[in-house]
Amino acid sequence: MHHYKGSEWNKWDLHIHTPESGMANQFGNDWDKYVLSLFKSVIANNIAVIGITDYFTIDGYKKLLTDYLSNDQKMKSLFTPAEISAIKNIAIFPNIEFRLKTIVNGSRINYHIIFSNEVAIEDIEENFLHEIEFVYEGLPFDTPNKRKLKRRNIEEHGRSIKEQQGEFKGSDFTVGCTTAVIDEQQITEILSKHKDKFEGKYIVAIPVDEDLSKISWRGQDHMVRKYFYQVANMFFATNRGTIDF
């Protein structure tokens, strides 16, 4: 006689930003404090899967894996043996957040690609991120100046914006991330181009409450909303009504 387990539910949190995101956060650049807080909270809340999120890069995910999870001495200096054992059972995925060129009520749509942790960091960077282009700050009437989506290019873009528009504050990277936009068609084409590396190893997620819910089904952007509902594999939602729907 065989016993088959029925449906099993786990808590997932796939949208956790790191200090590398360039956002204001309570940790600043104190990565030890961030990692301590992250995993103690995840363990306390019995979360099984997390998505380590950054804008346009996987720098935070890479740092977490190389400087902490792969560093036994560092982990032992921060956590108890029981905590380390619990951390090893947590699935950790890289989540890249893009700001798209599509505008909804004055705001850009955010678009997430969450990769399997089986995909090598080098493949995500070299065969995906660094093949994406964004429009770099240029001069009026010039041909659009495009740059590869690399951290130094984002920083240069942010620095140029700050020099021209004094109201932009924050680091060069923060301003670059705030103003850089991506065409989602590029993302789709590049992922399709490298099917041998990525097929079946990523999902598309969109924060429906922040973005898509602002688009009226009865307005001129009806097809925009419909398109993103069709391409998304999952939605981020905190609104009770959205979840029930």
PLM regions: where:
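Divalent metal-dependent hydrolysis catalytic cores, especially in the metallo-beta-lactamase
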Residues: F39-I58
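Divalent metal-coordination and catalytic microenvironments
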Residues: H15, D54, I92, I113
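Domain-core and long-helix interface of multi-subunit machines
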Residues: M1-V35, K40, D67-S70, K74, ...
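Internal, well-ordered alpha/beta segment that forms a basic, Gly-enriched binding/recognition surface
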Residues: E97-P144
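An acidic- and aromatic-residue-enriched active-site/binding cleft used to recognize and process polar
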Residues: H17, D54-G60, E97, D209, ...
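Extended, helix-rich scaffolding/adaptor regions
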Residues: T57, S85-I92, E97
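Short mixed-charge
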Residues: S70-I90
